[in-house]
Amino acid sequence: IFSENLFSKELSERENFDNLSKEISNWGRWGVNDQLGTLNNISDSNIMNAKTLVIEGKTISLSRNISKESNPFNHAPIKHVPFIFPADTMGADPKLAQEAAGDIFEIEYHGYSHTHIDAINHFGRNGKMYNGFPFEINSNNEFENLGVDEIGKLGIISRGVLIDLPVFFGVDYVEAGTVIRIEDIKRWEKKNNIKIGKGDVLLLRTGRWEQLRQKGYWEITKKSTGFHYSVASFLKKRDVAVIGCDGVSDVYPSGIKSKKDALHELALVDLGMPILDNMDLDLLSKNLERLNRKTFMFVANPLKIKGATGAPINPVAIY
């Protein structure tokens, strides 16, 4: 049975967090100039093995539509301005000119609505990012290291593993605020005869969007189902490449008042692990259940924006 919503006393101990941070650190593991962090765990064989998971040749987007509407989950709707190019810019004779249109986008994608990837430079601690790089914006108004462009050079292709909590628990959704611990993951592995391993993209479905459909909005910054920060130890031991969730992977509340996104900090700063937030995993869940599967080929390629702390993203499952 999954852990209840109540936190044990030790969850609030900052000392546990600090000790774990030191224990799991990947700083220097792949060299002092490494820019990829746990993406180094994805080998050629990981990609080749992921191909074998394509049985039906079907694809599913794991992204939500980017919303233009403000709501309690979306504090920053995308601003989208379409335009038609003036005729005099499309040909020497405006009467015979081609017709074309374009767009201007403005988006603040970090938050609780837009599906996005957190690049490794999204979080710092004491002025340092993963591998000791300075957590600072340079004179060119960009981070010099660990930007999403580094992830975009190779993209992310590997085996995807879906921990589908509602299916495992036999419910429509897992109540917001439920904490998932290492022992819960291992119970899921045992039941499904799957071992999460090196190079995997580990996705957690909580049923967030189904809870929204049935019960409406709630204050997500105070209650969100996700991993307890100690799961970072599991991610390190298993050499997981990337984590993602229909929430933000972190459980809210984290149990540490000064660390709202405790797992985010451990994953990004200590492990050097990119994170996928606000995914739509519902259709994937239905199709994998139909096939009695939990794994698939995962593909994602973020925008290559120099030094950016992440980007909107449209991951794809191929099965």
Name each model-derived stretch:
Residues 6-319:
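Active-/binding-site microenvironments in catalytic and ligand-binding cores
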